[in-house]
Structure formats: structure tokens, C-alpha cells
């Protein structure tokens, strides 16, 4: 049987030898066309033009583009590249690339390597073949990819990969990068203006991001015996193993030797590509692990995380693993997330979300800290929508990840600081102001010396010098949640600046004006702050009283993206137009429908073509056994064969339910497929098709416990998770 052959194969595997290629610091970014490489290979004027484009967003003219392309081509060929590609991130959530050779014949007998500014700056692509929400049709398919100078090109394998944006012929964004860049630009502008209240030398604020990538590793031979794992990325059925994660013995435990070899190989690949991987460890669930890089500028961090997942898949294959990024591949053990650590840093080297040792710097910290909380309070439904997907629905609110309710955790000490600021008067005496600055604002750094609590049930937590958005799914593209978070904070900082300036014009001193607005924001955003157990029923009831949203399903959450408030936000900041928002709403619904549809088809197939035939085969064995007992014991056989007869009856009952439920699920699917639009289809798949999954699974899992282990064809949880 394939299952037992796969088990033997998995158990006999040895770690793949991974040669060390020198010091890690010397490997770093060898295959990246970064600032150092450009400085060495480009003219001074061309280098200055590219730096200006990266830091100030200025356009590069065709002459300079040709010089850059020539330097890039020569560098890439020296690294073994034979092809180039515009590497982009369409709304599939993954990456896309088309390889074109540098090779070009010039005569019948001679060829050269050619790559010019035209090929570097812009390429044409078929936009209708990617998710576009109706923006592009087959008969008007043209789309464009355009070079993003702020994310350095890299050589992977034999291909020069040039990070690009992807837009329609009519200008609408068809990717995750374009609106992200616009959001980061809006936040830079808004944050810089506010930061200049405290330091006139600030001319730029950069958003930083660090993505903690969780994943499962399963032996390839074992994974190949599970059609559900190979097609959907998760197990649609399977009884839980007797041992799961209840002993807490996997988290931070010794890394298995095969996995460690994979990690070492992966890290070397990542370092060559400039991905600054730092931390590796076992996660909570069996066969679950985490990799975390050092934070980077947000646009680059998003690119690197997308690249990282591609690299992880390829390296896993070399080590005879299948890597699972699905948010909930196994029932009964933790799923996987991707905590996004978000912060703001000035070009003067100050982290705006890190407390300082001086009251004035801490006032700056409080300004950005409180404005971020206020932004989350105002737009929490959009943050929830930014992480909504059919796969992440299985994880959110499952007592292992943040609930679907967005709340902000800041810890007891900072709560006390905000409470003290909230009750302070507008008309403080000089002595009271000094007291407030020295003993409340001034002592913030000291608070962090003893702050060790971490509320894992909060979706948005302050962790000392950054905010950690924990609701992001492990397979998600980080561009979407980062774009939304950056946009709402940009909008809030803009509103803050207007309010403070109005008070200053009215005669208030700058510091008093800032305190006044911050006090108002503390009061208005109090409902989003929560320090307790986010998993509890009491919090769900309390959140409802506070007026916080609780969108438990993706179709429900995605509706927030096209609300009047959302459209006004994204249009006013210039991040997304109403047309783009409507398109993304349709794309999100379509993806949800297709994901649930595929899972439904696979589940029905496995139930009827694997589980039921195996159960019938075992039932026939039992029937033959009962017949034999009857021959031996005569009329008293029923007493002797009571257990077998009961088992035969139970198997028939489970098979009957499976058949009827699969049939009903297929009919529900047919009904959903004939509904007029994706909004109706998504609601139908969510409320009418998906509920069958658990019922069918329950009866299949019961049969797994009854059927002879020697006959069961599907690899079991204990074998998948403990090999």
C-alpha cells in the first residue's frame, strides 16, 4: 500500500548534506544589485540619478536607464544569469515572472547579450490572465510592469529578477506593490510633518517591517499520499493523534536533524539574496517551525517575504519536504501566522515608536503611539478585512491566534500613562506641567525595564518599540495589511497635524496644543484598548457593547473595503480609487468562492473514493467473520459476534450519512454556482456549502477509528506530524 511504502521511505531518509560556503556576513547580498554594486559599476551621474529615484521618487530618464541596464546586465551575467524577468506580485497573493533571454542574434552567425533601458523600465503583460476584478477583459488584456528602483534587483538561479509594479493599460493597480508604495509615500509625508514639531532636521520618515514566517514541514512521500494536502494545502479530514502539542514539548525544542539541514540550506540561499534571516526555532505544533528576519524598509520587507516563500518551497523540495504555508493545515494543533512588526524611523535615526530618556522625545513617542492607536480605533474593520481569506478564517479566533475582533494591547504600565494624561487638565500650572512631563512622560523608559507580559490574544500589540499585527495569515502577502495600516496612520497623522496647527493659530503654545489633541485621542480611542483574554466570551460581549466589529467570516469582512468610509480614506490619501477598491472586493470574493469550492470537491472525492470503499472493504471482512462464527457457534453466534455486528451497523450508519451529506453538499454547490454575482456566491459558499465540511469530516474520522489500520489508505495524523 502507498501509505506504508511512504512511511518506510520517510523513516529511512537522512539529512541532506549542506556545505558551508564561508562566513555568513561574506555571503550576504552577493546576488543583489544593491547600492554597493551600483556604485562600482555605474557612472557617477547614473548612480546619483538612481539614488535620487530611490530616496526622493524622481523619474529616471531614458539615457540614464540605458546606463543602469548595461551595468545591471553585466553584473547579472557575471553571476551566471542568462535571462531576466520583471518580477511582480499580482493579486493572486504570490509572485509572477516571465523569463526573457539576454541572448539576441544580430546576424546569422553572431549573437550578443542585449538588455537596454526599455526592457528595464517597462514591459507589457497580459493583465486579463491575472485577477483584475473586471478591470481587464480578454479582448482588452494589456497591462504593464514597471521597474521599482527602491527594491534592488537580484539574481536567483540563472535569472535576473527586477522587482516591478503591475498596472492595467488604463492605469489601475493590479498588484499589491503599487498601493503599498503610495501608502508608504503618504505616511512618509504625514509623519515627517508631525516629526518636525520635535526636530526640524527630519526630512523623511521610513516605515519598517519585520515578518515572522511560520510554516509546517511534511515529508514529501507522506504528503503525496494525501490528495487534500497536495491540492488544498490542508487536511480536510483525519482523526487527531493521541499526542499533539498538549505536552508543550515542541516549542523551542531541539530542531530535528533533517529540518536543521533544511534551515541551514535555506539561510544560505536567503543571505545570498539579501534577506537578513536571523532567528529559527520550533513552533508550538509538531512539525511546525518559524523563521524571522531582521526588520527592513517596508516595501523591501514585503518583497523579501514573497521571495522567501518561493525560496522555501524550492529548498524544501531539495530536502524531500513539502512546506505548508496554509494557516490551518491540521485540526487540533496550532495553525500558522505571520506576525508583522511595524514601526517608523526618521532619517535622523530615531525610532518614533521607541521611548526615549528625555520628556520632549517621549512626547514625540506618545504622539505617534497614540495616533497609531487612534487610527486602529477609527479603521479597525479595514485592518480585519486586510487579513481576510478563506484559509485565515480557520485560524482567527481558534484560541491559538488573535480573535476576529481587532483590539490594541499596550500593557498595564502604558495604560497607566495614558490614564494619567487623560485626566490631566487643559490649564495646567507650570509646576503641574513639569510634574506631568517628568513623572509621567519622562519615566516611560523605566517602565519597560520590568515589562515582560505579552498578551498573545491581542491582534495588535505594542511590544516596546513597534506594533505587532498578529492576525496576518502565514500564506498572505504582507503588502495588503501593511498598505492598510500605513494608510490609516497617514490619515490620522494628517488629522492630528491639522488639529494641532489650528490650536497654535488660536494662540496655544505648541506643546499645550499637542497635549490637548492627544488627550482627546486617548478618550476617543479607549474602546479599542483591551488588556484581558481575547479568547473569552466575555470579551466578545464587551466588544459588542463598545461598538467594535466582529467579522468572523471573509465575505462579511471584505464588505468593509467598499464602505463609504473606506472609499473616502483611500481616495483622499491617493492610495486606491473607488474603481480599484471595487475590483479588489470582487477579487477577494472570487478567491474565497474558488478556495471553498476546491475544498468541497476534494473532500467529496476523498470521502466517496477513499474513505467509503475502505470502510466497505473492512465491513465485508467483518461480515465474513460473523458468517464463520455462525457456522461454529450456531444459534448462539449473536452473543459471540455482538461487537462485530455492532461495528457493521455503525459503519453502515456512517457511510449512509457521508453519502447523503456529500450529495447535499454538491447540490448546495450547484445552487451557489448559479447565483448572479460573487457577493451572493461567497455568502452561499460560506453559509450553505462550508457547513457540510465538519459533518462529513466527523463521520470520516469516526470510520478511521473503526477500520483496520492495515486497510486505511490515507496517511494518518500521527504519521504526518511525528515523522
Q: What is each residue range found by the language model?
A:
Residues 11-116, 121-137:
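Histidine/acidic residue-rich metal-binding segments in metalloenzymes
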Residues 64, 88, 116-117, 293-295, ...:
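Active-site proximal loops enriched in glycine and acidic residues that flank catalytic Cys/His/Asp
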Amino acid at each position: 500500500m502507498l501509505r506504508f511504502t511512504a512511511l518506510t521511505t520517510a523513516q529511512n531518509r537522512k539529512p541532506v548534506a549542506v556545505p558551508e560556503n564561508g562566513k555568513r556576513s561574506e555571503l550576504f547580498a552577493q546576488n543583489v544589485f544593491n547600492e554597493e554594486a551600483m556604485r562600482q559599476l555605474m557612472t557617477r551621474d547614473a548612480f546619483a540619478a538612481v539614488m535620487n529615484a530611490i530616496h526622493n521618487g524622481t523619474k529616471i530618464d531614458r539615457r540614464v536607464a540605458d546606463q543602469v541596464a548595461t551595468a545591471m546586465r553585466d553584473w547579472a551575467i557575471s553571476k551566471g544569469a542568462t535571462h531576466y524577468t520583471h518580477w511582480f506580485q499580482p493579486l493572486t497573493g504570490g509572485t509572477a515572472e516571465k523569463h526573457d533571454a539576454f541572448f539576441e542574434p544580430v546576424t546569422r552567425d553572431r549573437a550578443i547579450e542585449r538588455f537596454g533601458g526599455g526592457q528595464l523600465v517597462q514591459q507589457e503583460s497580459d493583465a486579463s490572465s491575472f485577477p483584475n476584478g473586471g478591470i481587464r477583459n480578454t479582448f482588452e488584456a494589456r497591462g504593464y510592469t514597471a521597474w521599482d528602483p527602491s527594491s534592488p534587483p537580484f539574481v536567483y538561479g540563472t535569472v535576473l529578477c527586477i522587482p516591478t509594479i503591475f498596472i492595467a493599460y488604463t492605469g489601475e493597480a493590479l498588484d499589491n506593490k503599487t498601493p503599498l508604495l503610495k501608502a508608504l509615500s503618504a505616511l512618509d509625508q504625514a509623519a515627517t510633518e508631525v516629526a518636525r514639531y520635535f526636530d526640524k532636521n527630519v526630512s523623511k520618515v521610513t516605515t519598517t517591517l519585520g515578518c515572522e514566517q511560520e510554516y509546517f514541514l511534511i515529508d514529501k512521500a507522506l504528503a503525496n499520499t494525501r490528495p487534500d494536502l497536495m491540492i488544498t494545502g490542508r487536511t480536510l479530514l483525519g482523526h487527531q493523534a493521541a499526542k499533539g502539542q498538549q505536552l508543550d514539548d515542541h516549542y523551542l525544542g531541539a530542531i530535528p536533524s533533517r529540518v536543521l539541514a533544511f534551515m541551514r540550506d535555506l539561510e544560505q540561499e536567503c543571505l545570498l539574496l539579501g534577506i537578513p534571516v536571523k532567528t529559527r526555532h520550533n513552533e508550538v505544533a509538531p512539525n511546525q517551525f518559524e523563521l524571522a528576519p531582521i526588520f527592513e524598509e517596508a516595501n523591501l520587507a514585503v518583497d523579501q517575504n514573497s521571495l522567501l516563500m518561493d525560496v522555501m518551497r524550492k529548498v524544501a523540495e531539495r530536502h524531500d519536504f513539502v512546506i505548508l504555508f496554509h494557516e490551518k493545515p491540521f485540526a487540533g494543533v496550532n495553525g500558522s501566522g505571520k506576525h508583522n512588526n511595524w514601526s517608523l524611523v526618521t532619517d535622523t535615526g530615531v525610532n518614533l515608536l521607541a521611548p526615549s530618556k528625555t520628556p520632549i522625545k517621549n512626547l514625540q513617542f506618545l504622539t505617534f503611539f497614540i495616533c497609531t492607536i487612534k487610527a486602529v480605533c477609527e479603521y479597525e474593520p479595514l485592518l480585519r478585512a486586510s487579513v481576510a481569506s478563506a484559509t485565515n478564517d480557520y485560524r482567527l479566533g481558534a484560541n491559538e491566534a488573535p480573535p476576529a475582533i481587532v483590539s490594541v494591547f499596550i500593557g498595564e504600565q502604558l495604560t497607566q500613562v495614558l490614564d494619567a494624561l487623560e485626566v490631566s487638565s487643559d490649564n495646567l500650572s507650570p509646576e503641574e506641567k513639569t510634574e506631568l512631563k517628568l513623572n509621567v512622560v519622562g519615566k516611560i523608559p523605566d517602565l519597560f525595564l520590568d515589562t515582560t507580559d505579552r498578551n498573545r490574544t491581542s491582534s495588535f500589540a505594542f511590544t516596546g518599540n513597534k506594533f505587532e499585527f498578529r492576525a496576518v495569515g502565514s500564506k498572505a502577502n504582507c503588502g495588503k495589511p501593511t498598505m492598510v495600516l500605513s494608510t490609516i496612520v497617514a490619515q490620522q497623522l494628517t488629522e492630528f497635524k491639522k488639529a494641532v496647527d489650528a490650536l497654535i493659530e488660536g494662540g496655544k503654545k505648541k506643546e499645550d496644543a499637542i497635549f490637548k489633541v492627544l488627550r482627546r485621542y486617548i478618550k476617543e480611542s479607549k474602546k479599542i484598548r483591551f488588556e484581558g483574554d481575547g479568547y473569552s466570551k466575555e470579551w466578545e460581549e464587551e466588544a459588542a457593547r463598545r461598538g467594535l466589529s466582529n467579522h468572523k467570516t471573509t465575505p462579511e469582512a471584505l464588505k468593509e473595503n467598499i464602505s463609504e468610509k473606506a472609499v473616502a480614506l483611500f481616495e483622499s490619501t491617493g492610495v486606491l480609487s473607488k474603481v480599484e477598491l471595487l475590483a479588489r472586493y470582487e477579487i477577494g470574493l472570487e478567491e474565497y468562492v474558488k478556495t471553498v469550492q476546491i475544498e468541497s470537491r476534494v473532500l467529496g472525492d476523498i470521502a466517496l473514493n477513499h474513505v467509503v470503499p475502505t470502510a466497505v472493504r473492512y465491513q465485508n471482512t467483518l461480515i465474513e467473520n460473523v458468517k464463520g462464527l455462525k457456522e461454529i457457534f450456531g444459534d448462539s453466534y449473536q452473543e459471540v459476534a455482538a461487537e462485530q455486528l455492532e461495528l457493521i451497523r455503525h459503519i453502515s450508519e456512517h457511510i449512509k450519512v457521508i453519502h447523503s451529506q456529500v450529495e447535499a453538499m454538491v447540490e448546495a454547490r450547484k445552487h451557489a454556482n448559479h447565483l448572479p454575482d460573487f457577493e451572493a456566491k461567497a455568502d452561499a459558499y460560506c453559509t450553505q456549502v462550508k457547513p457540510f465540511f465538519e459533518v462529513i469530516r466527523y463521520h470520516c474520522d469516526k470510520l478511521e477509528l473503526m477500520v483496520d489500520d492495515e486497510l486505511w489508505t490515507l496517511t494518518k495524523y500521527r504519521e504526518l506530524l511525528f515523522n
